[in-house]
Swiss-Prot record:
It comes from Aspergillus oryzae (strain ATCC 42149 / RIB 40). It comes from the Eukaryota. Residues 21-123 form a coiled coil. The chain crosses the membrane at residues 143-163, 305-325. It holds the Pfam family She9_MDM33. This is Sensitive to high expression protein 9 homolog, mitochondrial. The lineage of its organism: Eukaryota, Fungi, Dikarya, Ascomycota, Pezizomycotina.
Length: 328
């Protein structure tokens, strides 16, 4: 699981490098750093302002007290003289502290302005990079849509030029094989029906001849018996053509053969009506069949798949049209 997550992370990083999104991520981190820097600079500006205001207030208080002492210098006491000396000595220190606070405030303000300018620059760079990345993704999406449409058109042409004729030829060949198989079965059935009476006719005379020969061999050679035997044999021989009827069967054999030949010729004639798959007539029939009123039986799954494919194709075409007519 850890390897899968690491592989997904590496794949996402590679994809970001290819699309140029890694630079946008770096700019985001830089903007976050600049925001922290600007926040700290503004805090220092606020502290410097407070320190500068405190220094100004301290010096103003000292100068105000010095002025009050100078106004009543004719009534000074020893403590007033000592206080005036201390305030006059600290006035220079207060002035230096005020100047240092002013310089610190100016430096903090300059740093804050630089941080704000750098932040604005980083934001503009990020906006520019995002625009470039968006244009690149839009361009890749447009080319990808064109590529998918080209693949679909190529598959359609391959299916119509190669697969559809092969499937049609296979169907025609299968139909021919089934017709030939049915004709062969019908021939075999007719052959069996023709040979069955002939075999029966050949088996029927054999039994009487065997039966008649037995009494002839066992009989006593008398003139009356010989006459009766000869009459019986002659009547049996005359009855054999009547019992066995091979003549009508031999006449039906050419008729059945002719009917089978007629059936085969009609099947070949119907198959010859189909034009070759690479001809213009075949394309014309195919296009007219697409817009014909022929009833079809389609499953719900095929209908849903057709609707989804149509919706995807329409969305792709509309996206392509919007991408083409959209102003830069």
């Amino acid at each position: 699981m850890d390897n899968l997550q690491s592989n997904i992370f590496v794949a996402g990083q590679r994809l970001n490098d290819l699309t140029g999104y890694s630079s946008i991520e770096a700019l985001k981190k830089d903007i976050h750093t600049q925001e922290e820097r600007l926040r700290a600079a503004r805090l220092r500006v606020r502290e410097a302002k407070d320190a500068y205001a405190a220094a100004i207030n301290n010096r103003s208080t000292s100068q105000r007290e010095v002025n009050e002492l100078l106004q009543r210098k004719h009534a000074w006491s020893a403590s007033d003289l000592e206080r005036f000396t201390h305030l006059y000595r600290n006035d220079h220190t207060n002035e230096v502290a005020e100047n240092e606070a002013q310089e610190a405030l100016s430096a903090a303000e300059r740093e804050s302005e630089e941080a704000a300018a750098q932040l604005n620059k980083s934001i503009l760079s990020r906006y520019h990079e995002e625009q470039v990345w968006s244009d690149k993704i839009r361009r890749m999406s447009t080319w990808g849509t064109w590529g998918l449409m080209g693949v679909n058109v190529l598959l359609f042409l391959i299916f119509q030029i190669a697969v559809e004729p092969w499937r049609r030829k296979r169907l025609v060949k299968g139909f021919e094989e089934k017709v030939i198989e049915a004709i062969e079965k019908e021939k075999a059935m007719h052959h069996v029906e023709i040979l069955a009476p002939v075999n029966a006719a050949q088996e029927i005379p054999a039994a009487p001849s065997a039966d008649s020969s037995a009494p002839v061999v066992a009989a006593v050679p008398s003139p009356a018996a010989e006459e009766t035997a000869s009459n019986a044999i002659s009547t049996e021989v005359l009855d054999v053509p009547d019992s066995a009827t091979p003549a009508p069967d031999t006449t039906t054999t050419p008729n059945s053969q002719n009917s089978l030949n007629d059936l085969l010729e009609s099947a070949k004639l119907q198959l010859s009506r189909f034009p070759p798959p690479t001809s213009v007539e075949s394309w014309r029939q195919y296009i007219s069949d697409l817009f014909s009123d022929r009833n079809l039986v389609i499953t719900q799954r095929d209908l849903s798949s057709l609707a989804l494919q149509s919706a995807a194709a329409g969305a792709a075409i509309m996206g392509l049209v919007i991408a083409l007519i959209r102003p830069r």
